[in-house]
Amino acid sequence: MVDNLDITIDDYFQKVEELKNNGFEMMVDLTAVDWFRKKEPRFELVINFLSVSKNKRVCIKVKLTDELSIPSITSLYPSANFYEREVFDMFGINFENHPDLTRILMPDDWVGHPLRKDYGTGRIPVQFKNAPKVD
């Protein structure tokens, strides 16, 4: 069973720290959802935690304001590092005090954030290195 918690940005870091101090050893997933034209606020951060010792899971959901900025939790869970970078790269969400908030999947000079629902597709020709030739 998973406990779902909807929390505010202001409570986010403190709640994650509380989970860490109460036996939730693992942050197992961190992603974002773009609710474009369906919900306000548009973006939501979803983070899953696991306590092996207690055999419990917790899912935290945080609705993001228009600033799209939230504290990084890499100081509490180093495993959040690449997840936060991926969410930054794909959605444009800023993680304050992240040790290396740079693109992780897209080229450094890429413009835009491809998993946003308003991101145009098919506009930019992409050259794939070592792509097999197809007849």
Locations of regions flagged by a protein language model:
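Terminal low-complexity/charged segments
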Residues: 1-135
